[in-house]
Each structure stands twice: as structure tokens, then as C-alpha cells.
């Protein structure tokens, strides 16, 4: 499955999602250009100059404070892979879900009115 296919699929699966964040590097600009006309809410995000490890560390206090909730794997079995990647970071072969989590937590904590972020 390509990144375009994945974004299209997730957009169909979660039509209530207002923003779809796409990293503005590598093939991200081409994806943004292609999907912006097709899917509402496509937004570029920049990783900035910090390392992936530093970006992940910047949101760890939100997790440590108990302000992020994820579905139990019993109800959402697909969460297992994501949790494994988060917990095993940076020693996992893939870490795209870590980036996605960082962008989501940063965006939601900037906009959150209350202390709880629900996923």
C-alpha cells in the first residue's frame, strides 16, 4: 500500500477527522499536492530541526501525566503494533507511528481546553 492509498483509506475509515497531517519532507509535498484537491483537511507539518528522539521526548510528559488514552487492544487489536513501536522506540525497525503520535499530541495539546486527550 502506498502513502496515497493509506491516507485515502484512513480518510474513508475516519471521515470525522478534521485534519490529516502530512510531513512536509521527502515525498510529502507531492502527496500534499495530489490529495489537497481530493481530501479536505490535508495539512503540511514540518519535523523541524530536532531529532526524532528529541521530538518524542518533548511529548513524553503528556503521556507520563496520564493525559493520553489509547484504546485497549481487546477493542482495537491494530493498536498492538503501534504500542509496540512506541514502547520499543528508538530500537524498532520502523518508527513512523512515533512521528504521527508526536504530531497529533503536539497539535491536540495546543488546542485542548481540558486536561484529557482522547484517541
Regions found by a protein language model. Name each.
Residues 62, 103-104:
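Generic structural signal for bulky hydrophobic/aromatic residues embedded
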Residues 93-94:
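Short glycine/threonine-rich catalytic loop with a Thr-x-Gly-x-Asp
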Residues 1-89:
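Mg2+-dependent endonuclease catalytic cores in nucleic-acid-processing enzymes, primarily RNase H-like
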Residues 100:
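P-loop NTPase catalytic core of nucleic-acid-dependent motor ATPases
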Residues 97:
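Phosphate-binding/switch region of NTP-binding enzymes
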Residues 104-119:
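Acidic two-metal-ion nuclease catalytic site recognized across multiple nuclease folds
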Amino acid at each position: 500500500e502506498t502513502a496515497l492509498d493509506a491516507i485515502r483509506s484512513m480518510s474513508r475509515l475516519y471521515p470525522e477527522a478534521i485534519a490529516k497531517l502530512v510531513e512536509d519532507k521527502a515525498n510529502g509535498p507531492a502527496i500534499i499536492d495530489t490529495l489537497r484537491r481530493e481530501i479536505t483537511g490535508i495539512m503540511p507539518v514540518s519535523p523541524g530541526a530536532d531529532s526524532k528522539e528529541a521530538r518524542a521526548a518533548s511529548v513524553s510528559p503528556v503521556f507520563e501525566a496520564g493525559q493520553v488514552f489509547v484504546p485497549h487492544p481487546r477493542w482495537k487489536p491494530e493498536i498492538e503494533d503501534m504500542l509496540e513501536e512506541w514502547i520499543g522506540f528508538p530500537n524498532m525497525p520502523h518508527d513512523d507511528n512515533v512521528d504521527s503520535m508526536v504530531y497529533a499530541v503536539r497539535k491536540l495539546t495546543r488546542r485542548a481546553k481540558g486536561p484529557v486527550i482522547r484517541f
